[in-house]
Amino acid sequence: MATDPRKILVTCALPYANGSIHLGHMLEHIQADIWVRYQRLRGNDVNFICADDAHGTPIMLKAQQMGISPEEMIAAVSEEHQKDFAGFDISFDNYHSTHSDENRELASHIYLELKKNGFITSRTISQLFDPEKEMFLPDRFVKGTCPKCKAEDQYGDNCDNCGETYSPTDLINPKSAVSGATPVMKDSEHFFFDLPQFESMLKEWTRSGSLQSETANKMQEWFESGLQQWDISRDAPYFGFEIPGETNKFFYVWLDAPIGYMGSFKNLCNKRDDLNFDEYWKKDSTTELYHFIGKDIVYFHSLFWPAMLDGAGFRKPNNVFVHGYVTVNGAKMSKSKGTFIKAGTYLNHLDPECLRYYYAAKLNSRIDDLDLNLEDFTQRVNSDVVNKIVNLASRNAGFITKRFDGKLADNFVEPELYNEFIAAADRIAELYETREFGRAIREITALADKANQYIDEKAPWVLAKEEGKEQELQEVSSVGINLFRVLMAYLKPVMPELAARTEAFLNETLTWEGVAQPLVAHEITKFKALFARIDPKKVEAMIEESKEDAAIEMAAKEKAEAEKEKASQTELDKDPIADEIEFDAFEAVDMRIARIISCEEVPKANKLLKFQLDIGGETRQVFSGIKSAYKPEELEGKLTVMVANLKPRKMKFGMSEGMILAAGPGGKELWILEPHEGAQPGMRVM
């Protein structure tokens, strides 16, 4: 008996809106998309949503560095993110932003409900404060020397060198990463979510049996160490939502970020008449809610998020599906090695379905890291998808289209073999449901091996050359096409584009239940190449582009740091005062007021301007290297200061009879000295 479709809401963690999507992000989004597509293939009602996490100090500061508003920056990043996800066929029903009216309304509502119910407290805390930028500094915006190993230039929360964790106040010689100033301690009132009040509820939720064992075990460790109140506020300046009823106080980004799931769904509900927000989020909802996240944010999703929802009168997630990190070639992704690969860079060179297949082949339901070994990636995709699966169609389609006008045989001659393929449906379905995608792929490729073994044994290419074997040729080739059809129905959640091309070739929509019966007397279309092999040269080109991107990014970062360092220096830092001289030496220099009678460019000279100067009854010709800073017509008629007793110097372009005084580091940053109009040509400068 048919059961009612399940109503499911699925989310991915919200990418932060200050950078590009990379292949580490794509693991989660591909994993979730495969699960979502499987559920849809089985007839379930799934809404798949995401958004950009668009608040916080890093976004505010990066926008300042770029000279644009945070709103402009997050809009551009959102456009890039959505383009990348679309490129990988991530089938979101809605992609929104935490910087939205829906999210502001929901964040305020949840906060006020928590406050009304006694779950919000406040107290004064002391924090490091940048006196130049007049802002409190998050841990990652303080740098200094590690208190344990003494490594320099370490962040305020942990040391990259020795792994020690600490408070920013523990750093030796701390400096603001924003301005370079030495931070000071300053008091401020902050607001806290009283997480310990939810300990019994969270323990019960943990013992429900639905969470991954690794997550449940980690939560037990946190319970044993004691739950702490959670600081949910930040002081101005801050890019985010102001806390209702407070001045210059903002929600910490991690309060409104998970509420972004609700905000994105609310936005989707506003676009559609068939969705009811409360049906999915009310406390007694019978719909299903699942979050796909990385292991680095388990703390927020398994403790704070369900507690916030419960305290504000909303339902909790059915489960939080956690995955590990992505490594490349057995190591952490590296920009210098070109293995820190952006999604857009990958799409410039390779088919997204290749990565979807490879990730699926290695994914399981545990919190294991996944290694993207690029050599294995090439070999596995070419071996499995091209040689085993797609080749099954290409080996048989030509006989059907050329010899039988594209028509499959009127009867199916291998029912036992076909039933073996169909019998695997329940096993593969269970593996998809439980996110054991790697095992599902192994089941599918094992079936592909059996299908190819059958074709090898029947050898249709031999039958095609023998007289009187026409019917057998059609029947054998039809079996091959039908077995390929079943395999592609099973692979449809993983490789939707290949499935779509297969549907066009078969002249049929692939459904899970529809392949239970083979196609007989069915007309297919002319076979076209369905899938291309991975060319190792394209993988190499992707790595090279990643290296180039990293080099450009590093150069820009170094330039920005140099400019920041330069801006923090005084003029004396840049150009220290020269050694002392005796007064007589200074008195020997005769400086006079001069009026610029004329000024002109010197042909074939890159830096020089030619001046005629009136120094009070005498005219002097002087050459000065300030062409990069001034146009000649800007200077004519102005007063300036010259060294009048400098020995004349014969130059290529004529005799220079003195020196005009100017200040500045050079280039366009030069300024001639201009005395007040009361000064007259010829007056001595004392």
UniProtKB/Swiss-Prot annotation:
SUPFAM superfamilies: Anticodon-binding domain of a subclass of class I aminoacyl-tRNA synthetases, Methionyl-tRNA synthetase (MetRS), Zn-domain, Nucleic acid-binding proteins, Nucleotidylyl transferase. Keywords: Aminoacyl-tRNA synthetase, ATP-binding, Cytoplasm, Ligase, Metal-binding, Nucleotide-binding, Protein biosynthesis, RNA-binding, tRNA-binding, Zinc. ATP binds at K335. Its EC number is 6.1.1.10. GO terms for molecular function: ATP binding; metal ion binding; methionine-tRNA ligase activity; tRNA binding. GO terms for biological process: methionyl-tRNA aminoacylation. A motif ('HIGH' region) lies at residues 15-25. PANTHER family: METHIONINE--TRNA LIGASE, METHIONINE--TRNA LIGASE, CYTOPLASMIC. Is required not only for elongation of protein synthesis but also for the initiation of all mRNA translation through initiator tRNA(fMet) aminoacylation. This is Methionine--tRNA ligase. The gene is metG.
